[in-house]
């Protein structure tokens, strides 16, 4: 038999014993009481006392009785009141006494056996019965409701049929009974309200509330039936044995588990027997401790998760701020191991750094707030290891972001395929036989080939001493060809052989071999590290050649630097078609496919002048200030430095509140400054004029009449002064004498002739109104008609209400470029000029 069946049998036995005890007590009370009214009243009061005791026991146990049990207690009080009234009217008949005696004799034997079995029951069986009753309640409730309803209906019909003949005799007592029933109903309602309030507060309050409604309807129907049949029902309930159902057994088993003393057990069983005269379905008992424990556990888990997340965030922030000084390579290697969770074989130094970092993070996680000691938090969260940190929410978020960034980097960068490195020397490239190097191959396998290769290299050293001259000639040939310093995406046999020859010669000629060949198992899958390793091999080979042949040191240094630069350039420029590295199954030495030697530009071979390391010869033009100077001349360099700083400070234009804008264009605007403008505007004009004089090569001379000058500035969209025009009032000008030009075929020769030839002007003065003292445009902004637009604005705004003609404008001592501009603007070479020092004198 299973444990559940045993628990059912035990619970049924216990309920039978408790029922027998209750019947014995009722029979004894009925026998001892006299036939008088007082005796009958005392006999009727006993179940009421038991009900009061049961209520106190419920308060002592702290049990939450269901609404069905409350309704049963209400029905019990009602039936007790009915019994009290009926007993006062009529005495007990002889037939009832006989039947009670028979029931007492039959049940006395079962009570003794039940008490013994009840005391023999262990706590383990009681707990099992409680568990089984709880698990089977939900299954049996639906079927039990229907059976109880059928039993109630059949009982009511029998009671009504039997009591119809005697209803006329009890009409006098019905009035008193009705009053008491109303009082009982009010008491029952109050009890029900209190019970529902307690039940609704519980997590299963809604379910109980629905069941409470069903019990209330059943109790109301029972009360109505009891009003109709008062006397006969009480007798039959006293005579008829109490029906034993599975629900009653469950309720009794639950109360027996809670009760620990025999007296409390008896009171609880008497309450159950009196309250279950009509079979009703009790609700499953919900322990208070289970709900409280669940809430406490949920709160603790939430607190723990929140504190864990906060500590992780704080630890990460602190680690980010403290570990800034560490090298980026170490940090990247540590971070790559955590998100990918791939076991890469690294060096001992990297492992120590990773272990040290994890230890520091564990120490920091114990202190969230630096000003407080969080020992209780440490005790709660002391079991958190690195594995839990990896599985936490914060680390997952960080790892997902880091993986996306790392994937983006890997897509942008190159992971070139690797090819086998073989040292087969091709005679077609070097055009020299080399039997020793042809027979050797740098192939590394998993079975200890490293030591064999070193032995071969040592043997080669002794043989290569005899052919040093040949090695020197080969070295010179390879150094003359700078193609060894450049890289490409594809490998061809002849460049590979030349590269292998270089590496082999460096290995053979070096007295102490500094670089070591690593097997493919130690090479990580990062393409950047592979290319870096290849660059180190090349650089080491070059350095070893420097030691053996010191005569070619500068060229070798240059080639090593170009090797590294070309490797980095190719790593950036190779398209991301090759996504992963492919290693051979038998662990051989491999190099990136992008390492290719090609023919480079033959600039070094055509060097005609020995520069001695100085590449900047001749005239150099500054890209910012536009000044043309000689870089090798210290005086020119100092002049350029002064002009450059002056130009930068003068060209800046922040903007003014009040600007006199004459015209606006897509590429800028033209403003005019007058002598009566604010001081900051005049100061800016003076600064610009000084810079223009230095650029044009004029001497610093004051204007004729400062109070009558007008300055036009062209401001670009990027807030820089790119054009300046200073105009003043004059009275006379002198016309330039145009000479006949020789036969010139091209425009370039014409411009060259105009700049080189001397020109003169007439001595006859002609009237002029406007004299352009200075007109300047930034050299980088020329050929954009900035000067022409400034002159147009000057002609329309120099005199209010009039537009000057080109014949009324004179230029002051123009430069060759200024003369060309005036000729193009005026349309003739015979334009007016004047001396800006003294406009009245002739030039």
From Swiss-Prot:
Uppermost EC category: transferase
Disulfide bonds: none
Family: Belongs to the acetyltransferase family. ECO subfamily.
Molecular-function GO terms, alphabetical: acetyltransferase activity; N-acetyltransferase activity; protein-lysine-acetyltransferase activity; zinc ion binding
Zinc finger (CCHH-type): 620-644
Binding annotation for acetyl-CoA: 775-777, 783-788, 815-817
GO terms classed as biological process: peptidyl-lysine acetylation; post-translational protein acetylation; regulation of DNA replication
Origin: domain of life: Eukaryota
InterPro entries for this protein: AcTrfase_ESCO_Znf_dom (IPR028005), ESCO_Acetyltransf_dom (IPR028009)
Ranges for region Disordered: 1-78, 262-300, 546-584
UniProt biased composition (Basic and acidic residues): 566-584
Location in or out of the cell: Nucleus; Chromosome
Gene Ontology cellular-component annotations: chromatin; chromosome; nucleus
Pfam families listed in its UniProt record: Acetyltransf_13, zf-C2H2_3
UniProt modified residues of type Phosphoserine: 202, 415
Biased composition range(s): Acidic residues: 18-28
E.C. number: 2.3.1.-
Main location: nucleus
This protein's name: N-acetyltransferase ESCO1
């Amino acid at each position: 038999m299973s444990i559940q069946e045993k628990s059912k049998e035990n619970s049924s036995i216990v309920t039978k014993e408790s029922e027998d005890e209750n019947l014995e007590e009722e029979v004894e009370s009925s026998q001892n009481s006299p036939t008088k009214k007082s005796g009958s009243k005392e006999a009727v009061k006993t179940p009421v006392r038991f009900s009061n005791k049961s209520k106190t026991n419920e308060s002592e146990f702290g049990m939450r009785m269901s609404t069905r049990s409350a309704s049963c207690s209400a029905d019990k009080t009602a039936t007790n009141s009915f019994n009290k009234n009926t007993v006062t009217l009529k005495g007990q008949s002889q037939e009832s006494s006989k039947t009670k005696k028979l029931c007492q004799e039959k049940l006395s034997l079962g009570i003794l056996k039940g008490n013994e079995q009840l005391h023999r029951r262990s706590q383990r069986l009681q707990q099992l019965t409680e568990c089984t009753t709880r698990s089977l309640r939900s299954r049996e409730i639906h079927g039990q409701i229907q059976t109880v309803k059928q039993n109630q209906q059949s009982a009511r019909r029998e009671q009504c049929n039997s009591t119809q003949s005697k209803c006329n005799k009890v009409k006098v007592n019905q009035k008193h009974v009705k009053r008491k029933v109303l009082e009982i109903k009010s008491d029952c309602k109050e009890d029900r309200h209190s019970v529902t309030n307690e039940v609704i507060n519980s997590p299963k309050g809604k379910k109980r509330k629905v069941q409470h409604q069903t019990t209330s309807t059943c109790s109301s129907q029972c009360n109505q039936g009891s009003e109709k049949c008062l006397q006969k029902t009480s007798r039959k309930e006293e005579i008829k044995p109490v029906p034993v159902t599975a629900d009653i057994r469950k309720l009794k088993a639950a109360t027996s588990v809670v009760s620990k003393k025999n007296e409390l057990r008896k009171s609880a069983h008497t309450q159950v027997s009196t309250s279950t005269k009509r079979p009703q379905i009790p609700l499953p008992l919900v322990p208070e401790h289970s709900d409280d424990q669940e809430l406490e556990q949920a709160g603790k888990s939430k607190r723990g998760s929140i504190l864990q997340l906060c500590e992780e965030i704080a630890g990460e922030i602190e680690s980010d701020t403290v570990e800034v000084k560490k090298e980026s390579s170490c940090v990247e290697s540590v971070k790559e191991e955590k998100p990918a969770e791939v076991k890469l074989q690294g060096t001992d130094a990297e492992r120590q750094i990773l272990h040290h970092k994890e230890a520091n993070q564990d120490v920091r996680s114990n202190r969230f707030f630096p000003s407080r000691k969080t020992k209780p938090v440490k005790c709660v969260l002391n079991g958190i290891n690195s594995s839990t940190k990896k599985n936490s929410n914060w680390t997952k978020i960080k790892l997902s972001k880091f993986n996306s960034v790392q994937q983006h980097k890997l897509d942008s960068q190159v992971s070139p395929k690797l090819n086998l490195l073989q040292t087969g020397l091709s005679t077609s490239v070097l055009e020299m036989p080399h039997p020793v190097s042809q027979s050797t191959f740098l192939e590394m396998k998993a079975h200890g080939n490293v030591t064999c290769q070193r032995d071969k290299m040592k043997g080669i050293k002794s043989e290569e001493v005899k052919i040093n001259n040949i090695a020197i000639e080969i070295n010179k040939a390879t150094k003359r060809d700078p193609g060894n310093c450049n890289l490409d995406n594809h490998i061809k046999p002849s460049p590979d052989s030349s590269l292998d020859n270089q590496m082999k010669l460096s290995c053979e000629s070096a007295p102490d071999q500094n670089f070591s060949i690593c097997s493919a198992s130690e090479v990580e899958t990062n393409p950047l590290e592979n290319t870096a390793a290849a660059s180190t091999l090349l650089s080491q080979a070059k350095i070893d050649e420097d030691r053996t042949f010191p005569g070619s040191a500068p060229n070798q240094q240059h080639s090593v630097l170009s090797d590294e630069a070309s490797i980095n350039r190719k790593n950036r420029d190779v398209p991301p078609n090759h996504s992963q590295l492919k290693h051979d199954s038998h662990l051989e030495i491999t190099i990136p496919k992008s390492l290719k030697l090609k023919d480079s530009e033959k600039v070094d071979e055509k060097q005609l002048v020995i520069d001695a390391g100085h590449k900047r010869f001749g005239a150099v033009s500054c890209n910012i200030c536009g000044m043309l100077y000689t870089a090798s001349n210290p005086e020119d360099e100092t002049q350029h430095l002064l002009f450059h700083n002056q130009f930068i400070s003068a060209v800046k234009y922040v903007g003014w509140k009040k600007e006199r804008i004459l015209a606006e264009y897509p590429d800028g605007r033209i403003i005019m400054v007058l002598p009566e403008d604010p001081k900051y505007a005049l100061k800016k004009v003076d600064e610009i004029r000084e810079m223009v004089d230095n650029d044009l090569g004029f001497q610093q001379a004051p204007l004729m009449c400062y109070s009558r000058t007008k300055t036009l500035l062209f401001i670009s969209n990027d807030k820089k002064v790119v054009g300046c025009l200073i105009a003043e009032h004059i009275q006379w000008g002198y016309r330039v004498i145009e000479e006949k030009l020789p036969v010139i075929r091209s425009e370039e020769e014409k411009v060259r002739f105009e700049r080189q030839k001397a020109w003169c002007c007439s001595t006859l003065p002609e009237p002029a109104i406007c004299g352009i003292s200075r007109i300047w445009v930034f050299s980088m902004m020329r050929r954009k008609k900035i000067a022409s637009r400034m002159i147009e604005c000057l002609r329309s705004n120099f005199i209010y209400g009039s537009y000057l003609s080109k014949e009324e404008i004179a230029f002051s001592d123009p430069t060759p470029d200024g003369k060309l501009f005036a000729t193009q603007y005026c349309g003739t070479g015979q334009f007016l000029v004047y001396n800006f020092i003294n406009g009245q004198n002739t030039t």
